[in-house]
């Protein structure tokens, strides 16, 4: 059970008192939260949003929401002044005014009662703290994957979202791609027969550091709130590589690596098509190597296998080691392989199947952002709900733990912990730098 997040900031500006000052001069947009009954949203009202984390992915997502006529973006937040001012300009230019607020501290944005929903696209080590605080503040959430950098962080997000009755869409947008859904529907409706193996491949060693300067302490550049950037992670001397992409993906303090970050995309599809992966106990084995260049230290390459009592196996490797990019379901009647480039099957006739009306259908979203906005209005779960994000995230994280400990582990999904293994269970959480805590 998640405790109240360590937010303070006068407890999100003490509600209304701080909100008066923060909302002066805002555009005349009635928040959807003030309309409708029992949490419902009128079809003509706009969903008022704020974006937290304005790097590449945050900008991409914000542009998608700007393109939705049922949304009004009123605030952006980033610890880098140049980024937040650029984001403010993007929003203001879109609406033709100067009304977008730009914040350094996400707590100031969350304290506004006119905001219905938030985008979270920060570095991974911030996801849990901000998502939990957002749910507690009554906001719906579009959260980039993964659900934190530790299993218990994802659990805290899940529990808090449900306790406060919020909508959360995980940024696993492959669920809004018809070919991924079709592959999963073939598996779920037993067109492949009994599934005996799932193969997942995700990027890993192909990503290299882009910040080429020496790994030495550098002056903190003007306009960067470095203390806020570090947040709950251990404080380390500033080096530009700590903010560069994909460099921060490769640093343990801010991310669990591609095994648990990018891997979430295809692990999510694996679990969507074969839900037993997160329902039954599994033995988890993983071997691999870690980066070690004085700055980056995350897992570089890996070969993991999860074994289930009924004979099902899932192998999860970095791309080409040996699994191909994507997700492959293998059954007694054939196989289907899907990734962002396409879908393949053996026999090929599987691809001509039409899922019958009385069979399992996995939704019809073709726009991940629009699906989220529709869920905010209807209060129904989106296509990638919080539970799905948590499960896909922890599959990668438990493989990383097995690799780090260099031994086989036994995972109990009902308890959400390893069996009779205190050392492994300690790694389900990460310590947070004071004053931050979950």
Residue ranges and their predicted role:
Residues 54-61, 336-411:
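C-terminal structured subdomain/cap of oxidoreductase catalytic cores
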């Amino acid at each position: 059970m998640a405790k109240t997040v360590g937010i303070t900031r006068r407890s999100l500006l003490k509600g209304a008192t701080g909100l008066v000052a923060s909302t002066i001069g805002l555009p005349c947009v009635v928040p959807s939260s003030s309309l409708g009954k029992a949490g419902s949203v009128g079809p003509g009202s706009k969903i008022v949003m704020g974006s937290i984390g304005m790097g590449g992915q945050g900008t991409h997502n914000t542009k998608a929401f700007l393109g939705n006529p049922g949304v009004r973006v009123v605030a952006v937040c980033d610890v880098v002044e140049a980024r937040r001012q650029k984001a403010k300009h993007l929003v203001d230019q879109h609406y033709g005014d100067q009304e977008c607020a730009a914040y350094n501290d996400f707590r100031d944005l969350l304290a506004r009662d006119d905001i219905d929903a938030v985008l979270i696209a920060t570095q991974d080590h911030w996801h849990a703290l901000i998502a939990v605080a957002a749910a507690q503040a009554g906001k719906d959430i579009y959260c980039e994957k993964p659900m934190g950098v530790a299993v218990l962080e994802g659990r805290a997000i899940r529990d808090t979202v449900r306790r406060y009755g919020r909508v959360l869409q995980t940024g696993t947008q492959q669920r809004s791609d018809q070919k991924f859904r079709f592959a999963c529907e073939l598996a779920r409706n037993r067109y492949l027969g009994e599934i005996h193996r799932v193969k997942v491949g995700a990027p890993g060693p192909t990503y290299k550091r882009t910040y080429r300067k020496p790994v030495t302490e550098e002056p903190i550049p003007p306009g960067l709130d470095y203390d806020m950037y570090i947040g709950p992670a251990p404080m380390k001397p500033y080096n530009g590589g700590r903010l560069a992409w994909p460099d921060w993906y490769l640093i343990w303090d801010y991310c669990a690596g591609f095994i648990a970050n990018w891997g979430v995309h295809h692990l999510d599809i694996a679990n969507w098509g074969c839900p037993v992966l997160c329902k039954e106990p599994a033995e988890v084995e993983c071997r691999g190597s870690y980066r070690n260049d004085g700055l980056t230290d995350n897992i570089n390459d890996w070969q993991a296998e999860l074994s289930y009592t009924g004979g099902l196996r899932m192998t999860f490797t970095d791309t080409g080691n040996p699994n191909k990019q994507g997700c492959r379901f293998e059954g007694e009647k054939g196989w289907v392989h899907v990734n962002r480039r396409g879908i393949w099957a053996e026999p090929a006739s599987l691809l001509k199947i039409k899922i019958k009306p009385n069979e399992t259908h996995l939704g019809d979203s073709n726009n991940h952002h629009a699906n989220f906005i529709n869920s905010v209005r209807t209060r129904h779960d989106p296509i990638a709900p919080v539970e799905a994000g948590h499960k896909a995230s922890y599959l990668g994280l438990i493989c990383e733990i097995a690799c780090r400990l260099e031994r086989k582990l036994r995972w109990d999904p009902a308890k959400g912990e390893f069996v009779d293994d205190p050392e492994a269970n300690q790694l389900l959480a990460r310590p947070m730098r004071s004053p931050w805590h979950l």
